[in-house]
Amino acid sequence: MLSRASIRAYSSIPNSVKIAAKESATDLTKLSVIINNAGSKTGKSGVSHLLSKFTFLNNGAKSALRFTRESELLGGTFESKVTRDALILNTTFLKQDLPYYVEALGNVVSNTQFAPHEFNEIVLPTANAETKLANANPAFKGVEKLHEITFRRGLGNPLFYNESTPIKLEEVAQFSKEQFSGENISIVAEGANEEDLTKFVSESAFCYLPSSSSNGAKALPTNTFTGQEARVPSSGASSALIGIPVKPADFGKYEVLSAAIGTSTLPSTSTPLAQIPGATSHLYKYQDAGLFVISVSGEASQVAQGIKQAKSVAESVSSSALSEAVKAAELSVALQSTVDSPLNVKVVAEEAPISKFNYVAVGDLDVLPYADEL
């Protein structure tokens, strides 16, 4: 199912930058620049995260302070985020300010200065703080470890920068130069006229980007592994997670299974996992593969019992329960589909095996079970 918020067709300018837009009845425009092959799965571990912290800093056209103040006066918002597939720049603003933000985003991707003082005083501290905050959550640490043991490299790379893998400023700048090419960039907007958007993009710094880069880093082939286990000692709350690698063609099956047992996207008190404290499921979807995760978080003894119960729940879902969950799965997919990450997943009520899985325990390892004890 394709969300109503998603956009089907792209036009392009001569350097292969892809453009798509749909109009809306509101006065707001959501404009996103998606740089594919610039996510955490590509290049050195952490370099994409550091690059995301350089966006909206000083560039050849204007300073970060000037852009921030101008955006505040216009009432707009902006952010950058890194996913495993891409680096994404998001802006939201009033419709009449579309030319300003197209110009600003064009300068971000084509003209960032990569100043040494910004790297040391802003980029590294901000990235380290985000990494520390994320790793304070045992469920996040568990999901990261599940990706690592399931995919190893590529999609198994950590989402965020870690000081254990040193990265120089020159490496971030080079990664930007290699990945910020027209063939990798899609510009999508909700609440904008596509003809106007294409005109503004063609008049902006986006047109200075090369069509392609022969030296660009390529994502590694996606290999998956099962039967793996990892145990991570951690203070505070505990988390136990089961992960099943999923082919893109099977996304629909696992979305239905997730809806049937209880999904984090569409919480419901009537699902089986809702009866287990701290339990939920989610299908992480990427361009080349996915990872279906069943997790339980909370106090260690509750997690130890809960993960066993959650696994049993997933193994015992009936065909009738899957059929009844189709509509909920369609709604869940629609809720996950956004302007910057549109989904095209056809849900189907078919068996979604979980027999071949990976397992991660985070927290009090004296209490949390091993995989063969589930």
UniProtKB/Swiss-Prot annotation:
The keyword Transport applies. It is found in: Mitochondrion inner membrane. One of its GO terms (cellular component) is mitochondrion. Disruption phenotype: Leads to decreased vegetative growth on several carbon sources including maltose, citrate and acetate. It holds the Pfam family Peptidase_M16_C. The keyword Kinase does not apply. GO terms for biological process: mitochondrial electron transport, ubiquinol to cytochrome c. SUPFAM superfamilies: LuxS/MPP-like metallohydrolase. It comes from the Eukaryota. Induction: Expression is induced by interaction with host macrophages. Expression is repressed by nitric oxide. Expression is also decreased in stationary phase. Expression is repressed by HAP43. Its main location: mitochondrion. It is a peripheral membrane protein. Keywords: Electron transport, Membrane, Mitochondrion, Mitochondrion inner membrane, Respiratory chain, Transit peptide, Transport. InterPro entries: Metalloenz_LuxS/M16, MPP/UQCRC_Complex, Pept_M16_N, Peptidase_M16_C. Residues 1-11 form a transit peptide. One of its GO terms (molecular function) is metal ion binding. Belongs to the peptidase M16 family. UQCRC2/QCR2 subfamily. Component of the ubiquinol-cytochrome c oxidoreductase (cytochrome b-c1 complex, complex III, CIII), a multisubunit enzyme composed of 10 subunits. The complex is composed of 3 respiratory subunits cytochrome b (COB), cytochrome c1 (CYT1) and Rieske protein (RIP1), 2 core protein subunits COR1 and QCR2, and 5 low-molecular weight protein subunits QCR6, QCR7, QCR8, QCR9 and QCR10. PANTHER family: CYTOCHROME B-C1 COMPLEX SUBUNIT 2, MITOCHONDRIAL (PTHR11851:SF209), METALLOPROTEASE (PTHR11851). Has antigenic properties. Elicits a specific immune response in systemic candidiasis human patients undergoing malignant hematological disorders. Component of the ubiquinol-cytochrome c oxidoreductase, a multisubunit transmembrane complex that is part of the mitochondrial electron transport chain which drives oxidative phosphorylation. The complex plays an important role in the uptake of multiple carbon sources present in different host niches. This is Cytochrome b-c1 complex subunit 2, mitochondrial. The gene is QCR2.
